Amino acid sequence: MTGTCRHTRRILLATLFSLVTAAPALGAASATASKSGDTFTHSEVLVQAESLFGKGAKGMADVIEKAFKEYGQPNAIIKGEEAGGAIGIGVRYGKGVLVTKGGATRSVWWQGPSVGFDIGGNAAKCFTLVYNLRDTEKLFQRFPGVEGSLYFVGGFSLNYNRTDDITLAPVRLGVGWRQGANIGYLHFTPKRELLPI
């Protein structure tokens, strides 16, 4: 009888040990599944971008692929339009719709100044990948440009703006001419504002 009790106790201890050591792995797996379920896949982003830029827009897939390689899957996107101009000091104004992976939408506006060697004017469609936005209210702040992050392919441009751990990757396709080097930021607001600062 004592041999049977020892054997049963060993089986129970082994089972308990297996459950305790497997629990962190199960938790990590569910966290990963939850995280990937809260983000847009590459193909979902391409479908959303094509709805703004048009199907088969040359260069669009390349700039989106670059953002995916550098930052992974976004958990929100902004589809909109913007216009701006500069003679040394520039301004940019935009309006769009924030779309979260859960399907919630919200109108947003952005504006921002720039200072530098910059001249010209332009209007653009703007598709922004948003990373690490856990609360949509956190979008409404200033996002400085990330130095050295400008990338061009086939008329499309990509750059990054970042505050804390939230990163924005605006993809633009526009008309007009604006040339130069500048520094600035984008300020997102829940309603239209005329002052770009």
Please provide the spans of the model-predicted regions:
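N-terminal export leaders
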Residues: 9-13
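Small-residue-enriched, tightly packed secondary-structure blocks
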Residues: 30-197
